[in-house]
Each structure stands twice: as structure tokens, then as C-alpha cells.
Amino acid sequence: MADTDIFSFIDSRIARPNVWPRNQHVSHPDWKTLYVRVTKRPLDGQIRDPVIDLANIEAKRPGRGAFRALVAELRKMYPQACIFVESVQPERFQQGLLRMGFTQRDGEPSFYLLPVRT
């Protein structure tokens, strides 16, 4: 398990954007595996910064709302950030992201939410 919790990692990278690494496996009580990157990314016709990328994720209890809860926490704590979910393979998860309001990136199995506020 990763030693750094997700929120400490994101806070440090948003506060100091030039500090490396910008990506890391992080810890969270609901997740076995959670890889996070804080970066800039072109989304919806603009370069967005910050973007919180989520990849290589595995819930401890799949199907119990861990992802929905994580997104709600991230939106509350980082309303200025986009959330990007990278390389989503299961079609059921893709459909769930769309129901949650995510937009699918053209030609990719990746999805994003724009900031709560810009």
C-alpha cells in the first residue's frame, strides 16, 4: 500500500506545481490501488490546470459506491480542478461515468469532469 494519502499528495502538488513527481500510488481507506497524477491537460477546447488524473484504481469493495464517494470528496475539496479518469475498460464503468456527468474524450476510453468553478 502507498504511504502518502491521496489528499496530502494532491494538496502538495497543487500548492507547488513544479515539484516532482506529479504522479504516485496513494493511499485511501476505500481503495486497494489508487494511482493519481496532478497535471495540465487539454480538455473541452482549453488547457486545464489543475487536472486530477485517476488511473489504475481498484476498490476494496467494488460496486459499493467507493468511486462515487471519491469523486464527491474530490469535487468538494478541489472545486477548481478537473477530474480525468484514464483508460476505462469495463463498459459498465464507462456507462456509470456517463451517468455521473462525465464526458467521454473523443476516440478514447477516458472520461472527464470540468471544474465545479472556473
Each model region followed by its residue ranges:
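Non-catalytic substrate-recognition and accessory regions of acyl/acetyltransferase enzymes
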Residues: 1-64, 69-118
